Amino acid sequence: MRTRDQEEFQRKKIMLMEKCYDCYAENGLASVGIRKLAESCGCSSAVLYIYFRDLDDLIVQSTAYCMKKVEDDFMAKAPTDPQDLMRFIDEIPYWTARQHGKKYRLMYQVYTHPKYIRYGKQFFEGVNRRYTEYAKSLEPKLGIPYTTITPLIFILIQTCVHYAMFEDECYLQSQLEALKQAIRLCMTQYRTEDARPDAKAES
């Protein structure tokens, strides 16, 4: 296949994955068949089988691609300045719910299904790697080891996802308050340690 043909094939495949995922997100995994997917894409069922082996392949690839895009959207909003951190923590759950609530509900339908759970494990292995790298980038700015930052990021992500799916304000506020307290304690602790005379001597 020529490069231009490959690019066009991939462009069309991405469009199909996005439209199919949106269709599932609006209607639920169990309520949508190949015919309804084709209608949402403006094509015939046969066209979908050019790009995907079967319905399972379409579901797996569409979920992985679209949720990676959601993750990219989240990371694009993530602060690099520590001064923006608390504001970000307060705002990001509501943004996540508005922008991606339906997509997260569908993701959990897919990745908790016995047929697809192994793909969910693979997806979240990638998530773990990417957020660990983000934590490493924050380490010199916050003065907190990335091994401490990483679990705090995971708590924030889980809190955002839970709120996006269920809009549970009580759970959200309790988690955010605990998270912000933990961050403040960590920042105080590591600043205190850095200020110790023996710490300066070691450095």
Tell where the protein language model's regions lie, with residue ranges.
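Short alpha-helical scaffolding segments that buttress acidic/His motifs in well-ordered protein cores
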Residues: 92-93, 107-111, 153-160
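Hydrophobic alpha-helical connector segments
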Residues: 61, 74-99, 146, 150-153, ...
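N-terminal intrinsically disordered/low-complexity leader segments
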Residues: 1-11, 194-203
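Amphipathic alpha-helical packing segments from all-alpha helical-bundle domains
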Residues: 71, 115-143, 147-151, 177
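Amphipathic alpha-helical segments used for helix-helix packing
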Residues: 97-118
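Short, basic, alpha-helical segments at the C-terminal edge of helix-turn-helix-like DNA-binding modules
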Residues: 64-70
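Hydrophobic alpha-helical segments that form the core
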Residues: 144-166, 174-185
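Helix-turn-helix
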Residues: 15, 19, 23-57, 61
